[in-house]
Amino acid sequence: MAIIVEHDKRRKQILDNALIVFMDEGFVNATFQKIADQCGIARTILYLYFKNKKEIFNYSIKQLLLNVEENINSVRSDKSLNSEEKITKVLLTIFKLLEQNRQLLSVVLDYLVHLSKEGVSPEDRVRRRTVKLRHILSSMFIEGVKNGELKKMKVKAADDYLYSFIEAAIFQLVVTKRKNLSELRETAIFAIKQLSL
């Protein structure tokens, strides 16, 4: 049992250190050697845990998204908030996390461009990584309609509507290099109010 715990602990340490390398170097310039150096281990040891840098990157992103999902689920289960407040708080929480991880978002964009150049569909990767988030948004919307707090509309349309704010936030932070999302926050709050009864 102790060996498994040590293995998992070391794996998490590698992922945490790999994120630092990816943020400093970008996906294309990050190497197994740089990750090993950041971890303070031999490169050959990395191969005991991961087969290549793409696998490390994917697990690093997955770990980060799990953290985001935990934050969102805690908002979702907060009984003191109505549906409008929950959706607003979730979007604002996501905006804050995006602002805090601006550099990582640039690396993710770099990675998606890299995949596209390799002939791999970035859309499939993004969809797989965001399906839980979209499900959470959909379930919050369904709950709000069921409770008579939100207007009736197609769930997919509502989900796309809310998710478009997340995409806009990423675009503003990474592509247009906005300092913060204050204007988008105001727009999102206004838009969510329009969904309320």
Functional labels for PLM-detected ranges:
Residues 59, 73-102, 158-162, 185:
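Hydrophobic alpha-helical connector segments
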Residues 69, 73, 120-147, 157-160:
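Amphipathic alpha-helical packing segments from all-alpha helical-bundle domains
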Residues 2, 13, 21-55, 59:
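Helix-turn-helix
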Residues 1-9:
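N-terminal intrinsically disordered/low-complexity leader segments
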Residues 96-138:
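Short secondary-structure transition hinges
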Residues 8-16, 28-29, 49-73, 88, ...:
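An amphipathic alpha-helix adjacent to DNA-recognition modules
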Residues 103-110, 123, 127, 145-191:
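Hydrophobic/aromatic-rich alpha-helical bundle segments in the mid-to-C-terminal region
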